């Protein structure tokens, strides 16, 4: 299609979208097209700007789009951050962090038989140029799973952002085994309930599996709930683990982190009625605020979404902190404490 015709069609599409009374004016929404999934990923505060990636679908497959803001209200659209190619055939959920040398680094779940847990790095101020690693840091034997030398399967989907602790890098991977094993083969106790898998590295290239990160407790979650899209970080004098189960949406644990293990003390949900609050992602800014987003399901059918020519809405950003009673508090950034 000639470029001038593309411009005319794009302008016409923008006019249609701007006239949609159901399209939010102040939430982050998909620029156009039905985005399923629309997970926020790779959140990072970098050189005075809040950067947020999210999954979109193009002719090439699942990609990461990229937006940034100085004030969490006005957002700039950047070129796509990650596209399929090389070892992967699609880009699924992951996180972002700044390594010990100051390099912004993305972790993501690369789709395809030669992929797994993958990384990419950027060295430009706008984070517009990302270079993928030549090979996965953890290869998947099948989609979302790796197999240890003793034959034990371990989930390797939806990696968390990497963090540095006591001289090592650490990373969590999602518990896809609940879906693969327990949902299909009822009664396998070893695959019941949410958990995560902890990996450790000294160089961000070679990773060793340590053990399950925490023990799931049935008084809080159901046996058929997985743990995916994990986001783990310090909050006050505790640590918080944000995650989803695919059947009940966004939830969290607050607890203690020591000796490479997490001990949940309390549990809460951010989807009180359904699972429409989904796929959480957070960052910490220069003021020390822990700010999160999530994907909000519109609650409409695929046919309605395709007729509207778009789908994909983010929650408003919210700051998280602990109250004096060690329970979770949250508020829009403008109304939150200065540093939490």
Predicted segment positions?
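Beta-rich carbohydrate-recognition and catalytic domains
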Residues: 1-228, 234-274, 287, 294-340
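Catalytic and ligand-binding motifs that coordinate phosphates/metal ions
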Residues: 274-284
């Amino acid at each position: 299609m000639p470029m001038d015709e593309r411009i005319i069609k794009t302008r016409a599409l923008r006019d249609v979208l701007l006239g949609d009374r159901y399209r939010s004016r102040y939430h982050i929404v998909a620029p156009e097209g039905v985005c399923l999934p629309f997970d926020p990923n790779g959140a990072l505060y970098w050189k005075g700007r809040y950067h947020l990636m999210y999954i979109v679908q193009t002719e090439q497959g699942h990609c990461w789009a990229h937006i940034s803001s100085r004030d969490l209200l006005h957002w700039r659209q950047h070129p796509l951050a990650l596209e399929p190619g090389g070892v992967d055939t699609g880009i699924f959920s992951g996180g972002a962090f700044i390594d010990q040398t100051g390099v912004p680094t993305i972790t993501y779940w690369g789709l395809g038989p030669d992929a797994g847990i993958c990384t990419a790095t950027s060295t430009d101020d706008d984070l517009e140029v990302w270079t993928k690693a030549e090979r996965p840091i953890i290869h998947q034997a099948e989609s979302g799973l790796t197999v240890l030398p003793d034959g034990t399967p371990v989930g390797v989907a939806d990696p968390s952002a990497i963090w540095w602790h006591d001289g090592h890098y650490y990373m969590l991977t999602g518990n896809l085994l609940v879906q693969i094993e327990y949902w299909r083969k009822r009664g396998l106790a070893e695959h019941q309930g949410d958990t995560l898998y902890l990996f450790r590295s000294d160089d961000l290239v070679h990773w060793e599996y340590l053990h399950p990160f925490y023990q799931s407790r049935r008084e809080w979650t159901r046996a058929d709930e997985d743990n995916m899209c994990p986001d783990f970080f310090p909050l006050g004098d505790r640590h918080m683990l944000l995650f989803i189960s695919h059947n009940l949406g966004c939830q969290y644990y607050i607890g203690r982190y020591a000796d490479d293990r997490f001990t949940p003390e309390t549990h809460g949900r951010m989807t009180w009625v359904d699972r429409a609050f989904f796929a959480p992602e957070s960052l910490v800014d220069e003021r020390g605020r822990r700010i999160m987003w999530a994907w909000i399901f519109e609650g409409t059918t695929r046919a309605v979404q395709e007729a509207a020519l778009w789908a994909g809405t983010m929650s408003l950003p919210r700051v998280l902190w602990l109250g004096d009673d060690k329970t979770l508090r949250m508020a829009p950034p403008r109304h939150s404490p200065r540093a939490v």
